[in-house]
A protein has these predicted regions:
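Bacterial N-terminal signal peptides that target proteins for export
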Residues: 1-9
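Substrate-binding cleft of extracellular glycoside hydrolase catalytic domains
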Residues: 68-116
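Catalytic domains of cell-wall/extracellular-matrix polysaccharide-remodeling enzymes
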Residues: 100-191, 199, 209-230, 236
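C-terminal domain-boundary segment and adjacent tail
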Residues: 144-154, 213-314
Length: 315
């Protein structure tokens, strides 16, 4: 007798859980918190799975980090790092030429200024994250605080993953910037792109900012998320397998040769019909060890087995 025949409830429960198990995971992080409480409070009115990254030297850094944490949100340190371009830098911006002691001092002060932080991501930082020696010093400092690193990927040649080797610091990477342009149509396009990547690759991290246009787009589009997309915190993606989503290039079509002559179609042998019991055995064997099934089996033993043992024996 097959496994499903013995426990039909298991099959029904599995079918109910399968959409959740296959849902695309979308993480949204809003950077630059700590300067504009009015805008930031509108972000804090959104679902608590949306996380915030707080600039450590911003005037409202501690206040906004505490408020976000009290709501159950994930808080990150949004640490300024040196860009390739020459522009005014915030105080305590990390540079590749800094000593390990100086980097440790800045990170220690940032941890004090942004309470409840569980991760850190870079503000700008194309020059810093492209430097392997510089990022190795950052990862060594982060390892003392058990913070993960969310790479904002401001440069394609980032060395964050290589630099984390041997430090125990976990690295995850941004897939989409929502608001490089503050045009609402462009932000919607980027939001849709993030959803598509989450659906096809299993997960995606999108980064935005508390601009009025970004806030309006999120207010409009978050309630319309499809059922196969679930909002998650960045830390929930730390152990996700990394699957790069890139559209597959299409092979150029071969030109037709009108002089190939007449080709005869080969008669294919019809496939042998599969019996129902064989089909269910194959399906059962492929999913019995999945997480939803193991959960239900455990619950089944908890709910049903005790009831069976308590039934008095018949004389």
């Amino acid at each position: 007798m097959s496994y499903f025949t013995k426990t039909p409830l298991l099959a029904l429960s599995l079918l109910a859980l399968s959409p959740l198990a296959l849902a695309g995971k979308l993480s949204i992080v809003i950077d630059d918190f700590g300067y504009r409480p009015h805008n930031e409070n509108q972000i804090l009115a959104m679902p608590t799975a949306i996380s915030v990254a707080v600039l450590p030297n911003a005037p409202y850094a501690r206040e906004m980090a505490t408020k976000a944490h009290q709501q159950g949100r994930e808080v990150l340190i949004h640490l300024p790092m040196a860009p390739m371009s020459k522009q005014p830098l915030e105080r305590d911006t990390l540079r590749p030429d800094m000593s390990s002691d100086e980097i440790q001092r800045i990170i220690r002060q940032s941890v004090n200024n942004v309470p409840y932080a569980v991760g850190l991501n870079n503000h700008m930082g194309s020059a810093m994250t492209a430097s392997l020696p510089g990022m190795q010093k950052v990862m060594q400092a982060l390892s003392a605080y058990q913070l993960y690193f969310l790479d904002s990927m401001t440069i394609g040649s980032s060395q964050s993953s290589q630099a984390s080797a041997g430090t125990g610091v976990k690295v995850i990477k941004r897939k989409v910037f929502l608001d490089d342009s503050q045009n609402e149509a462009e932000i919607r396009k980027q939001f849709t792109r993030a959803v598509q990547i989450a659906r096809r690759s299993g997960s995606a991290i999108a980064i935005g900012h508390p601009h009025p246009s970004t806030i309006r787009v999120l207010q409009q589009m978050l309630p319309t998320l499809d059922a196969d997309i679930v909002l998650v915190r960045p830390s929930q993606l730390l152990n996700e397998p990394t699957r790069q989503y890139e559209p597959q290039p299409q092979q150029p079509a071969k030109p037709r040769n009108p002089f190939r002559g007449i080709q005869q179609c080969r008669v294919k042998q019809p496939p042998e019909p599969m019996k129902n019991d064989v089909f269910f055995r194959l399906v059962s064997s492929s999913i019995q060890e999945s997480a939803p099934v193991m959960f239900i089996k455990h619950r089944w033993q908890t709910w049903v087995a005790p009831a069976e043992t308590e039934t008095p024996a018949q004389p």
